[in-house]
């Protein structure tokens, strides 16, 4: 069994079972399918990478949700 990974999501420390992809993280956060952008350690993560790219211990993740308005 793998050790859990510790990441920071929108400024809050979190712990998840490893391995963890961006798609799995977004499912855990109940954000899958929404309108948002994801940043990892200061770099935007393309949606096309969500299913394959794994998070690493110590990653800093920011999820910015798009809000419509006028």
Language-model region placement:
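Ubiquitin-like/PB1-type beta-grasp interaction modules and other compact soluble beta-rich domains
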Residues: 1-69
């Amino acid at each position: 069994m793998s050790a859990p990974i510790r990441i920071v999501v929108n400024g809050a420390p979190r712990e998840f079972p490893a391995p963890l992809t961006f798609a799995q993280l977004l499912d855990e956060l109940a954000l899958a399918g929404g309108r948002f952008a994801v940043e990892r350690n200061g770099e935007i993560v393309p949606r096309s990478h969500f299913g394959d790219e794994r998070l690493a211990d110590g990653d800093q993740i920011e999820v910015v949700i798009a809000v419509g308005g006028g």
